[in-house]
Amino acid sequence: MRKALNSNLLLVLLLCGYAGAQEFKGHVKLLNNLFVPYPDTLVWFTDQTLENRLEVKWDVAPWLRLEAQARNRFIYGDFVENIPNYSSLIGSSNGFVDLSFLWAEGRSFVGHTEFDRLFARVSYSRFELTLGRQRVNWGIDLVWNPNDIFNTFSYLNLEYPERPGTDAVTLKAYTGSLSYIEAVYQPNKTADSSAYGVRYRANIARTDFQVLVARMAGYYVLGGGLSSELGQFAIRSEVSYFNAQKSSEKSVLVATLSADRSMGSNSFVQLGALYNSFGSRGSHEPLSLIEPRAQSPMMLSRGKVNLFAGVNSTVATLFIPSLAILVNPADWSAAVIPSLSYSASDNLTLALTGMLFAGNRTDEYPNIGQLAYFKVQWNF
């Protein structure tokens, strides 16, 4: 009860605070999902999600900014009705403070609110201190981010571009116009499960690079990344080595390399590869489509190697067809994601997206069925 009251109070403050805010924006989105399971293709599942996102920023003083962002979802349909404990799959919070709550739940529907940003940022001279639920973005690559140890996410979570936040204290010190040192502490229930790290980022000879040292639950981390240009291609790479603290655990190396290029003003092409020494072949955990997430930067893939290819283009300034493919070359399973979006106006978008799987039951991308959804999104 106390959790619900506190969360409702936060939501009321968010809704009422926009009047004095320097920036207030968000979106309303309707998703209509269709899932055809395999091998039982006779029973089709449908559900609908109505989502509202609110983002409020206040510049209280020249040195103080407050920011709050929340997403509110009402989900109803066959998934909720037929999947046991559905609400627990979307209602869990990965922060030190639980800022998510269920405000409606029935046999075939669930209502959920989550604050994924709620922080204060203090700036003084070359220093910047951020406290609260925030996005700690240490990633460089556009698909997989082994450097992003505080906010791990899954590429398959297509309808969450804002990405999750985490409860942390971040101190950033600018050492130049294009360089800074950043220290992060992410508390958890115990000291051993807490995480902390330091990153240095700079730009030399038109190359952005970073090095980091950190500790996360059970592992010490040493990593780095870069973003540069090679001819007409942008090259991005990240590598992280996770040194296990216990001899019974295995140390892990995760690395990515990608290249992307804009083809004129209308097309974008991207190729990428991921190596994960922790990966294996066969007997993978079941793939979840409800709330895809990577549990840690060591679990960005289930196999040792993943390949990625993606392309999108703009047709007649209004239509944007795109195609993304994730492949495990060890078992040749694949996730194929075609999409077509239409810009009806400056703030109204319609999109049709599919998520198709080709693989055996124990492969990384097993053919558990095919998913398609239609989206209508209004931004304000």
What residues fall within each predicted segment?
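Residues that define the transmembrane beta-barrel architecture of outer-membrane proteins
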Residues: W44-L50, G111-D116, S123-S125, R163-D167, ...
